[in-house]
Amino acid sequence: MTDSILKCTTRHIRIFTARCENNDLVQDSEHLTLDLDPDNEFIWEELVIGKVHKRFSELVDSYSGKDLSDYNLRKIGSDLEGTIRQLLQAGELKYNPDCRVLNYSMGLPRTKDLL
């Protein structure tokens, strides 16, 4: 494997080949660390976080035995972005009105008035 940390960075997902120790990332090719919505664009309930983590585990398992590459990490990150979009469109996830920049990066909120 490599001596440097591989990473995938999307708008709402960051994945690292590292583990957290004392709030620092330590390179570890045997672990993947998921940083979910680092900008706090959404309001997260534990059930929804659980769904994203479950999907993350499924995706990681699907790549078992394959090379851990930048491409595969980006593919996992992109698939997780799709999961977040689905949760938002289903109304299970909501935008955070108190986030730093409210830009509706996944589309305008879906309300009964707009449907």
Curated annotation (Swiss-Prot):
Q: Which reaction does it catalyse?
A: a plastoquinone + NADH + (n+1) H(+)(in) = a plastoquinol + NAD(+) + n H(+)(out); a plastoquinone + NADPH + (n+1) H(+)(in) = a plastoquinol + NADP(+) + n H(+)(out)
> Where's it found, cell-wise?
Cellular thylakoid membrane
List keywords of the entry alphabetically: Membrane, NAD, NADP, Plastoquinone, Quinone, Thylakoid, Translocase, Transport
- The catalytic activity of this protein is classed by the Enzyme Commission as 7.1.1.-
* GO MF terms, alphabetically ordered: oxidoreductase activity, acting on NAD(P)H, quinone or similar compound as acceptor; quinone binding
Please provide an example of a Pfam family that matches this protein in its UniProt record.
NdhM
Predominant location: membrane
The UniProt entry's GO CC annotations, sorted and at most eight, read: plasma membrane-derived thylakoid membrane
Similarity section: Belongs to the complex I NdhM subunit family.
Q: How does it assemble?
A: NDH-1 can be composed of about 15 different subunits; different subcomplexes with different compositions have been identified which probably have different functions.
Q: Indicate what this protein is called per its UniProt record.
A: NAD(P)H-quinone oxidoreductase subunit M
To which species is this protein native?
Prochlorococcus marinus (strain MIT 9211)
- Please name the gene that encodes this protein: ndhM
